[in-house]
């Protein structure tokens, strides 16, 4: 009886250790997803060819936005779905868009935008040159001629506090898995 009891005790101990490890892993994952990262679904075609409609992306909730970062803004408009756009300019910057040549200029420097689908020919109601208010960012979709973004007063500049996070990785569908730049 002593050997059977010891064997059962070892099995129960191993099972409890396994459950403890599983509970710890679940707790860590919950903390990371609560305070560090979040999953968002891309809605629409404004970021084509960088990100496509329906893709799932992982965003970093803790990183402040920088030039060229793709960010997610949640609940900013009555659209009701997260906006996914690229940071073009930050507070204090002056941006100009030449719709004839399709070029974007920030503080007198033409941006090298190898990520855009085509040159920027579509304009909205914001007049250029435009100075971005402090504490905000000017965002645009990579598919410029299919994107409603900071060029429109409907969206306008985004308050930095309204940015949910920076896009890190596209993970679904698996064929598109990779770091987003």
Report residues per predicted region:
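RNA pseudouridine synthases
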Residues: 85-96
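Short strand-turn-strand beta-turns centered on an Asx-Gly dipeptide
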Residues: 105-108
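A generic structural signal for residues embedded in beta-strands
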Residues: 59, 73, 97, 139-140, ...
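Residue-level "contact hotspot" at macromolecular interaction interfaces
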Residues: 50, 63-64, 88, 131, ...
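Beta-strand-rich cores of mature extracytoplasmic or soluble domains
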Residues: 126, 130-181
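Protein maturation boundaries and topogenic segments
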Residues: 1-82, 158-181
């Amino acid at each position: 009886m002593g050997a059977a009891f010891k064997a059962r005790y070892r099995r129960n101990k191993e099972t409890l250790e396994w459950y403890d490890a599983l509970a710890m892993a679940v707790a860590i994952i919950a903390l990371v997803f609560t305070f560090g990262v979040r999953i968002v679904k891309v809605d629409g075609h404004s970021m084509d060819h960088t990100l496509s409609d329906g893709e799932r992306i992982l965003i970093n909730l803790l990183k402040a936005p920088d030039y060229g970062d793709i960010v997610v803004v949640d609940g900013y408009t009555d659209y009701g779905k997260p906006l996914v756009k690229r940071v073009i300019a930050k507070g204090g910057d002056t941006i100009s868009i030449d719709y004839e040549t399709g070029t974007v200029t920030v503080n007198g420097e033409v941006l090298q935008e190898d990520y855009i689908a085509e040159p920027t020919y579509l304009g909205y109601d914001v007049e250029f040159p435009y100075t971005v208010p402090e504490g905000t960012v000017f965002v645009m979709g990579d598919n410029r001629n299919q994107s409603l973004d900071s060029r429109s007063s409907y969206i306008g500049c985004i308050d930095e506090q309204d940015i949910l996070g920076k896009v890190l990785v596209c993970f679904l569908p698996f064929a598109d898995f990779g770091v987003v730049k």
